[in-house]
Design a protein with these regions (language model features):
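Short catalytic/metal-binding and nucleic-acid-binding patches
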Residues: 1-148
Length: 148
């Protein structure tokens, strides 16, 4: 992922890699589309898996389901939903235990080599931490619902 991440074109706001699906929240900075970025990300991976297992064709059942983020509340709830996904699917007791997501970047209030600090610094720098916001989300049990 890090190799295909081009900071000028796409910013990874949040992500979670699951056993049978993934979630990316991406910010498009240029004319290069998110679907082009995803294609470049996965094409090499699919080719390697196909070679390794002497197979051909696609690996993924469905294509990406893009959602347009139109307001701040939707943005924050979407990030929470992404980070709570391992809990929703019963893979962990606590979302912090899932190491294949950007949750630790948010809880530690820092960007990593993959994630952008855009949302962390814009929304959670005034004393109200992401941890507080995420805890409220978990207590509301909204993660148990399908996200629209």
């Amino acid at each position: 992922m890090q190799k295909t991440k081009d900071k000028k074109n796409i910013e990874i706001i949040a992500y979670c890699l699951m056993h049978n699906h993934y979630h990316f929240l991406l910010y498009q900075n240029s004319e290069r589309s998110v679907s082009d970025w995803l294609k470049s990300l996965f094409s090499g991976y699919v080719q390697r898996i196909n070679r390794k297992y002497d197979r051909s064709g696609t690996l993924f059942e469905r294509s990406a389901k893009p959602k347009l983020v139109t307001n701040d509340n939707y943005l924050i709830e979407l990030i929470h939903y992404i980070h709570a996904n391992p809990l929703k699917h019963g893979f962990v007791i606590s979302p912090e235990d899932w190491k294949y997501s950007s949750l630790s970047d948010y809880l530690n209030n820092e960007a990593s080599k993959l994630t952008s600090k855009r949302v962390i610094s814009d929304y959670f720098s005034d004393g109200y931490s992401y941890q507080d916001s995420f805890q409220e989300y978990l207590e509301s049990k909204k993660y148990e619902e399908d996200f629209e």
